Amino acid sequence: IFGKPRLAFLVSSGAMDSMVSNYTANNKPRSEDAYAHGGEKGHRPDRALTTYVGAIRQAYKGTNIIIGGIEASLRRFSHYDYWSNTVKRSILLDSKADLLIYGMGERAIIEIANQLKDGKSAREIRNVRGTCWYTGKESDINALQNSTDTTEDYRVKPDNDTFDKKQFIHLPSFEEVKNDSPESKEKYALSYLIQEQNTDAINADILIEKTDSRFVVQNPPAMPLSTEEMDKIYSLPFTRKWHPMYDKPAANGKSGIPALSEVKFSLTSCRGCFGACSFCAITFHQGRRIQARSHTSLVEEATKMTKDKDFKGYIHDVGGPTANFRNDACENQKINGACKNKDCLGVNPCKNVKVSHTDYVELLQKLRNIPNVKKVFIRSGIRFDYLMMDKDKTFFTELCKHHISGQLKVAPEHVNDNVLRLMRKSTHKVYEQFSDEYERINKELGKKQFLVPYYIAGHPGADLSAAVDVALYLKKTGFVPDQVQDFYPTPGSLATCMYWTELNPRKKNADGTFEKVYVAKGGHERRLQRALLQFNKRENMNLVKEALKLCGRENVFKILYK
């Protein structure tokens, strides 16, 4: 199908890690793939990125191959692989690609293309932000660390546009982190901590990881895009259509790409997330800095949507990783980058967080006033703790009045405060305050609208007793979810590190070791926790009995089933 490219093959496995796409949280094959033709499963191979690169290498020996996207970005260093229950090497080495782009990649790909055009091979490109490269020569690493000219390729001080010397941090080697031993897991946790501390373009250092006789080097992340650059990217002539080859029915009789329906009439207003939930890898991919589009850009895109023959008057979403983040968390982030050892939100929100929904309110008002727009929904998730920190309740009222259709989906995730701490979520009390305020505002507006909370079963830190706490709260509120999300240890998240190591790299004990974390690893205990969160299902009653007996809380059975 392809000829040999002029510059390089650019390879991605899609908008989701191929193993996540192909398998459920309980490691069972999925019955469908929303990103494939007709929603059929089986169109994308397991470990797709490695498979694709191997096929290209076989067909076009000596061609530049550059990998990017979610699968590449979140597997850029040694990482725990849930599906094989092992620690795997950097995907840059396993795939045998020449260069890896991590993060969103627009800045990096332009610089790389220019260097390729000037005659460099991909293996020779080592000075581009947002990339990982490798070498088998220790002399290359020594030269890099001793060089004086690397400074002009790295840290940019945004206040005066001068350059600053970078540090070089050697991560624990693959050999040190790969084993299932306490010592190896301590090293793994340390490696993850260092990686997480170096995801900000301003203050990140250069990371080096040794694997056998080779070294993987991560250059600092790309600088955040300006509003003007974001606008330029999203003004490109995207068709909002699948390729015509998918118009014909697949073997299951269905045509098209199902996943498109959710995003076809949605607007991406921002990138990045300073919420940094432990179970989410967006921070590892996009960083904590918020990059937002202008109102003009979003209104123009929405206006174009209204001309689409399939548009029914409804904009499905206006958001990003977190819908109500439109600005950096604080002024310090713009100057010094996101703090390495402090969270913006969570159980103890930083006092420097600058809370405002004014810009988002104005944007939503403009979108509502576009001719032929009947309703503007918000579906990509509201960070309710941030919302509750805002003393101005204008957005909360506008949200209930204009942007919900009967129910609002939110993610408290748990009720046990220790589990919430490990999740980096707010305390349960904050959710209850939010729930009360939501009810009050809707009553004031004369609307009957409901909250649909999402909960995770089996997250690191959650034992059976913690799951019982959730069950009791659900009984008290009269809401039991139809769907419960089982914790899924996917590459790149803090929670996955906790799952593998049973350690919390974000907290140290007095002796310098990392805090120990309880982890439900057996499939049966995960089923027990899930059953507790759905105790109302008749088929779960025996599992609930078993769970209550195991954690010594048999008395709860009468409360749940009275």
Predicted regions and their residues:
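Glycine-rich beta-alpha loop elements in corrinoid/cobalamin-binding modules
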Residues: 1-211, 218, 518
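N-terminal pre-triad scaffold of radical SAM enzymes
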Residues: 249-281, 299, 314
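N-terminal [4Fe-4S]-dependent radical SAM core
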Residues: 186-266
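Conserved, mostly hydrophobic/aromatic
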Residues: 98, 233, 277, 298, ...
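Catalytic cores of alpha/beta
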Residues: 395, 459-475
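Terminal amphipathic helices with adjacent charged low-complexity linkers/tails
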Residues: 123-148, 161-199, 213, 222-225, ...
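Conserved SAM/AdoMet-binding glycine-rich loop
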Residues: 18, 304-452, 456-460
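Iron-sulfur (Fe-S) cluster-binding segments and ferredoxin-like electron-carrier domains
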Residues: 280-297
